[in-house]
């Protein structure tokens, strides 16, 4: 695999970020394996149209934490979401490199590793799960490479988990 350029995570705080999210979520190649609500594009469009830029992170972080995956120059190329679950110590991670021309360069792995560090070391989260479609071999390999282990089947998804105890 080719080596990825450095990436960093930041809050979704710009109108351009919202435009990118909406664009990515309209791409069937990007969303083919995502488990997102059908109304998410409408919700994001409404936020982009009505919420001032400084308030975007507040709205996107109401149910967990939301980050843009950015190249060194600040260009957003994907996102990571840590969503609260019914278990207070567990969050679900959802991730996507929205720029499909950048798939296979290691950006996803770098983003997941940074997210795990942030979650475990800075936010005090104890466990993170990822629900992955079994057909999504790339995402399954990524989860294993980042320390997730197969936990159980939940509907049409396999659930993988990483915990502070296992890192």
Model-derived segments and their meaning:
Residues 57-62:
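Short loop/turn motifs at secondary-structure junctions and domain boundaries
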Residues 53-56, 116:
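Terminal output helix/cap of sensory domains in signal transduction proteins
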Residues 29-53:
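Conserved GNAT-fold acetyl-CoA-binding loop/helix
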Residues 1-32, 66, 70-167:
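Acyl-donor (CoA/ACP) binding surface of acyl/acetyltransferases
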